[in-house]
Design a protein with these regions (language model features):
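Beta-propeller blade signature
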Residues: 35-40
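Repeated scaffold domains used in trafficking and secretory/extracellular systems
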Residues: 6-15, 50-60, 65-81, 113-124, ...
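A short beta-strand motif characteristic of beta-propeller blades
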Residues: 1-4, 63-70, 103-112, 146-156, ...
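WD40 beta-propeller blade core
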Residues: 96, 138, 180-182, 220
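Conserved beta-strand positions in repeat-built beta-propeller and related beta-rich domains
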Residues: 21-30, 88-92, 129-135, 173-177, ...
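Short loop/turn segments that connect beta-strands within beta-propeller blades
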Residues: 41-44, 61, 99-102, 141-145, ...
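Intrinsically disordered, low-complexity segments enriched in Gly and acidic/Ser/Thr residues
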Residues: 145, 149-198
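An edge-strand/N-cap motif at the start of beta-rich repeat modules
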Residues: 1-25
Length: 222
């Protein structure tokens, strides 16, 4: 495992040939200055990119209007669906589905036993959400937004499941308390301990053969 960026990384977005990430550039008078970098797999170089490039990658073509729906566009979670609609999740569990012109189609909450969802991931025509306070993952029908399946609970294999990443027929679950990356098979719903880190893992992303992890100390190439 190799550290490729030191510092606080907020969000990593996969590209077809690299990644874009937001990070803390500075803190001035308690205000966080956010900047953005891109890593290209073609040459391995880091490039500073504009905020609009980050927003386009995160929210799709109508990124300006979509970002207006977010209280904080850095911490908000988003999924650009195959039909170009965008599903948004805020820190407090409030959620929205926007048409490709940013028209609001649905709004509601993703909560379980009072706890807000921390992240969302798309698998086929279903939406998966993580709930750290209850140590569960929930599957929703994307058409009806009704809960269909729960993994975890009182004897959960998770320890505050947070950020999700779907790769093939599995969802990778970051667990900040145990510092473990847990793999869930989305066909059999079997749960495996995939990787154990020496510090809390906050995000996992895979692009091609390259795997990345965001830890307290920075961004790593696994």
């Amino acid at each position: 495992m190799k550290k490729i960026f030191s510092g606080r990384v907020f969000d990593v977005l996969p590209l077809s040939d690299g990644i874009i990430f937001s990070y803390c550039k500075d803190v001035i008078d308690e205000n966080t200055i956010v900047s953005y970098k891109m890593i290209s797999f073609e040459n391995g170089h880091f490039t500073d990119v504009a905020r609009n490039i980050y927003l386009l990658t995160k929210f799709g073509n109508n990124y300006k209007a979509t970002a207006m729906f977010c209280g904080n566009y850095i911490t908000a979670k988003s999924i650009v669906l195959p039909n170009s609609k965008v599903f948004l999740l805020e820190d407090n569990g409030s959620a929205a589905l926007l048409d490709n012109d940013a028209t609001l189609l649905w709004s509601g909450e993703l909560k379980y036993r009072g706890g807000a969802a921390a992240d969302i991931a798309l698998y086929k025509n279903t939406l998966w959400a993580s709930f750290p306070e209850c140590n569960v993952l929930l599957r929703y029908n994307l058409s009806t937004m009704r809960e269909e399946l729960r993994i975890g609970g009182n004897k959960s294999p998770f320890s505050r499941p947070d950020v999700l990443f779907v790769e093939g027929d599995s969802v990778m679950v970051c667990n900040s308390v145990s510092s473990k990356l847990i793999q869930v098979d989305l066909n059999s719903y079997s749960v495996f301990e995939y990787e154990d880190f020496e510090e809390p893992i906050h995000q996992y992303v895979q692009v091609g053969d390259c795997r990345f992890a965001v830890l307290d100390s920075g961004l790593y190439l696994i």
